[in-house]
Structure formats: C-alpha cells, structure tokens
Amino acid sequence: MKNTTCLKLSIIVASLFGFASATPAQRDAQIEVNTGVGLGNTPPIWLSLSGFTDEAAEVIRFDLYVQGFNFTNAEAAQYLLTGSNNGNVQGQLSDRFNKKAMLGKSYTGASLRRQAHALADDVVEAITGTKGIAQTKIAFKVNTGANSEIYVADFDGHNAQAVTHDNTIVAAPAWVPGKLALYYTSYRLGNPDIFYQDLSTGQRRAVAQYSGLNTSAAPSPDGSKVAMILSKSGSPDVYVAEADGSNLKQLTKTPEDESSPCWSPDGKWICYATRINERRVLCKVPAAGGAALRIPTSGVSNPSEPDWSPDGKWIAFTAQMGDFEICIVPAQGNGPATVLVSGEDPSWAPNGRTLIYARRQSGRYVLSLLDVPTKQVKDVFRISGSDSQPSWAK
Amino acid sequence: MKSTKLTYLLVLGLALTFAAAGCKRKPVNVTPLPEPRAGTVGGEGPSTLPPGESIKPGEEVKPGGLATTGLEEFENMVADRAALAAQTVHFDYDSSVVKSGEKPKVEAVASALKSDSAAKLLIEGHCDERGTEEYNRALGERRALALREALAKLGIDPNRIRTISYGKDRPVENGHDESAWKLNRRGEFILLHPKA
C-alpha cells in the first residue's frame, strides 16, 4: 500500500513539474515557408488568463501577444494561465487539451513588472520550446525637434533612458551582440562619425571619423568586426573593419549610394541596399570580400534597411511603394517578398519571429512590434518626441 | 508500534506533500529576480546607466594609426552661409543627378572659389522626409558628392571641398507636400574663410 501511494505521488509530482518534454500542441515558433501557414497566416496560440490584475496583467498580455498568443475564455483556450500579483507575481500554466499542468512558479525581487515579464518568458518557453523576449532590450533614436539622442529601454519601451547627451544629431544605434555596448552615429564632432559606447561605463571612442559620411555601423554576430557605410572614397560604400575600426577593408566600389549593411547570422555575408541600373535593390557581399550578388525582392520595389533573421532564413526590410511597408523575403533569394505591415526599418528580436519597426503617425515616428507568423502588432510604450531606428539586443 | 508511528508520519508527510504540490496547485518554484545594479541596462529606473562621456573635439581617434583623415585643414575656419545661399541646388526625388538647369549655380560657386584661393567649401546634402532614415543619409551624401564632382569638373581642387549629409534631419520647409519637399531636396554651399 505504501508503495502504491509513493508511486501515485511521484507520478503526480513529476507531471506537475514536467516541462515541455510532453509535446505541446503548437511548439513551432519558426516561420514556415511552404506549408500554407506562416508569414502572417499562422493562427495564434489561444490562452486563457485569469487572476492577474492591473499592470501585471497588462504586461503578461502584451508580452504574450507579440510572441503569437491571443486570449480567449477558459472553455476555448488550449492553455490556462492563472495566478496572482498580490505582492509578488505567481502563476500556474496548464494544458487543457492534454490535461496536464506545465509549470507553477512564484517570482520575487526586482519589480512587479519584471516579475510579470519573467513569468511571460517562462510560459513562452514551456509552450513553444524557445526562449521568450520579455526581458530583452532595445536601443533607438529619439528625435525632439532639431536634435536627437540615443536611448535604450526594455523591449516594450518601458524604463527608457538616454545614453547620449550630445545635443546634436544622432542616428543608427546598433547593439553589440552579447555585450552591454552600442555603436551609433553622432554629429558631436561636427561630422557624422561612428562611435562605440560601453554602456556600463559610459566610455566611448570614435571608430570611424573619416571625411564625409560615417554611418550605419553593424557589428558582426560574434562582435569581432563591424560593417559600416563610409563615403571617404567618393561615394557611400560598404566597409568592414575590426570592432575598433582598425584594419579597414572596402567591400563595395560603386558610384551609387550603398546603405544599411547587416550580417548573416553565420557571419559570412553582408546584405545591404544599393542601386543597379537606376533600380533600388538588395545585395549581399561576402564579408571576406568578393563579388556582390543580388537578392531579388520580387513583388515589391525600392527595398532598403534590411535585417537578417537570427535563423538565417529571412531578410526583413522596408519597401517604399508610395507608402512604406515592412516586408520579408527568403534570404536565399528563392521566393517572392511578402508585405507584412506598414512601417520601416525593421529589427529582428532574438526569437526570430518578432520584429520591431518604426511607423509614421501624425508627423512623427512611433515604435511598434510585429509577430510575423500571426501578424499581431502592438505599439511600444512611447517615450517622447519621435522614436525611430530601433535595434534589438541579441 | 514503531512501524505504525512511522507509517503515520509517512502518510502525513505524503499527504502534506500531496496537498502542497498537487491538489491545490500551489506553486513551489520560487524564482528570485536580481535587483537592478548600476550599469545594468534599463534597470528599473532612470539613473542606472551613465550617459556617454564627453568627447573633446580634435581628440585623437583610438586605436593609434587611424587619423581623422581629411578634416584637419577645415578646422579653424569661419563659415559664411549667406555668401552662396542663392546657389542652393535642388534635386529630383530619389536622385543625386545635378540637373542641367542647376549648372549655372554650380558655375557661380566655382567662380567664388576661384576668386578667393584661401577659401574652402562645405557642401551640405539634404533629403525630403519621404525616404527612410539611413537611406536618406546616404542619398544626402551622394548629392553633396555629386556637387563636389561637378565643381571638380570646373577646375576646383576637390581637396578644398568637404561634404556633410544631414539626411532628412534638417529640412528648410516643414510642410508635407511637394512644395516643401522640393525645397528640402537640396545641396547647400557654405563658404569657409580662414580665421584672420
């Protein structure tokens, strides 16, 4: 009798603390190409939320929505997330279809907001198997009229703080992968120059200070190199250098204006916008040097501001066709471009499915988040002025 | 006796564990989150990141070996925006081609530089609001460079000319129609005189 009770108990305990080892119904967080589902056609994961109130509830809803979840009542949802935020956040997640509890956790420390983000991340990971983005950071430009500054914030726009006070024009912040550091452009020294700033100390140094334009710094995925646009040779071209700007190498030599370099996640290619025979196109060039190849974007025109997805499969970019549209195209060039939502200047989250971008609203920019598979969008919490040129920390 | 007590304790223990972990589904995993430290990105409040420290103009670029190429000879000059303000060149949408109708302005700028051999020139390239930001920054630079090339063709040494692009950050007209946009798609000439 003892043995039977022990066995029953261990089964119950095991199932309560079991994680995503049992197959969740919708584990797939990646974007499918040819299944007919994906690229804005994927239905959301349905979840029922109860017990949370006020800010904690808002945070959990926001975080889950921009990662492809949506909310319904407990009779219709597959997943039930119940909990409370009375003093601290705690939550229990269960799968109603498969009749099992998936997690039960309580959070302490930091702030209620942060605890709610941590719960959202744990829910996303339990259901999809991939890491959530609720505790990630963004950098962006805040334009307050004549001048602009670089800001960093939580991915949802909260806890924003300025990291420059240059009282001039700044542009194009880019997070260094895995580091608390940014590259950005500032006119602080009377010219658009590229700086590297260590965010934990505030120390910064110029990385490119050549005559003409120095802008659009893009660190390589391992952080050892940086691509940038320099016009020192007479036309804006793609260059690559060591992370500190030394050992400069010119990768493109066209009379046209190249812009917005971005790296493939394997560090082998740099994609950028340029012009061929009067037509604006996307190209890629080997980071080690070599011939450039065109990346076709059939179905849309005037591509710019590309960003390569973390899984290497997609390039998100802006297409300017009267209005501005966020689009994606297979990075291998073997498929047409797909228009997703109105906006410009996309940057991928580390989860490879959420994009942050800027959209025009009443004469200024606001930042917005898009879950690519479900096309669910949410505006980021507004800071002030016009917020644009977002870069997601990875 | 002992075994009954033991059994009782065991059952009690199991029951409590069962109650705690099972039936009422109370969470037992407690995740403590780290308190924000200075230097942590976006801690929980405004002052946890130091702002970028000031950079002194003229500071040598690190690492050693990289010079601030090409700009030293433009330092310590006085800018005169008015002298060539009438020669601002306008461009077509999404283009850096210097139109033939604008060539007389370029010629006037060339004359001014030829008649004052100590003067240098700063060309500012600008765009209208309709492009995306980094694309416009590159296009503005391309416009300024196109004007420098045009001046070079008229015999002006390109080393006397510096370019700077402001993308769409510095419009002259704030309207949202073509009458404003066409004024913003421009190259401005700023004459530079050596300080007396």
Q: Can you name each region flagged by the protein language model?
A:
Chain A
Residues S10-G18:
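Bacterial N-terminal signal peptides
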Residues T23-F62:
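A structural "domain/chain start" motif
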Residues A76-D122:
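Amphipathic beta-strand/beta-sheet edge segments enriched in Tyr/Trp
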Residues K131, V142-E149, N167-T168, T185-I194, ...:
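A flexible loop/linker signature enriched in serine peptidases of the S9 family
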Residues G132-A134, P177-G178, P221-D222, P265-D266, ...:
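Residue-level detector of Asp-centered blade-edge/turn motifs that repeat once per structural unit
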Residues I138, L182, G223-A227, G267-C271, ...:
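Hydrophobic beta-strand positions that form the internal "hydrophobic ladder"
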Residues D154-I169, D198-T215, A241-S259, V285-N302, ...:
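Multi-bladed beta-propeller domains
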